[in-house]
Amino acid sequence: TGLIAPDKKTVDYIKRSDGQVPKNWMEFCIDTPNSDATVFEFDASSLSPQIAAPHSPENSENAEEFSNTVFDIAYIGACTGAKYVDLAAAASVLKGRRIASTVSLKVAPASLQDEKKALNDGTLKILQDAGAEFLPNSCGICAGYGKDRLTEGQVCLSSTARNFQGRMGASSSRVYLASPYTLSLIHI
């Protein structure tokens, strides 16, 4: 298990988003790791774009390793991969461009708040102009629910956090994971 202690920046974000901050939040902070803690430090900016192959997030490789993979669906969605910052990252790639005609781009903003912000600043318009189909804010495809769930044999590149077999629909579907930015770059 990996745990990341909340810091002041995290709590400030929660306060700004009308979230409830537990009164005892400081108990979860660590000034110095205790003897049982293992701390890993790395520079994320040194990583090349990554894609995780089915059926585990652990199956991560450099994105270029998947250049011959054909995707049916590009999905920017879920609470983990469709926050405002994610939608804006995808829009920064797709502005003035269209998604490949062979791919269906589906977007389900993480929350109504994220959707409203993206609507107000034109981010959703950029995604729409690029060919996005918008879905409701919900677990939907991510949890394999509803009419948009993956069908037999479909291949999806998704900004969700999990790609276990059958997670997003049919057990024969294959889900690859990528950031919204990487997902957008691959499909233009």
What are these regions (language model features)?
Residues L183:
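Iron-sulfur (Fe-S) cluster-binding modules
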Residues I186-I188:
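Conserved small/polar residues in nucleotide/adenosyl-binding loops
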Residues T1-S101, V107-P136:
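Accessory "access/gating" subregions that flank catalytic or transport cores
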Residues K117-P180:
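Thiamine diphosphate
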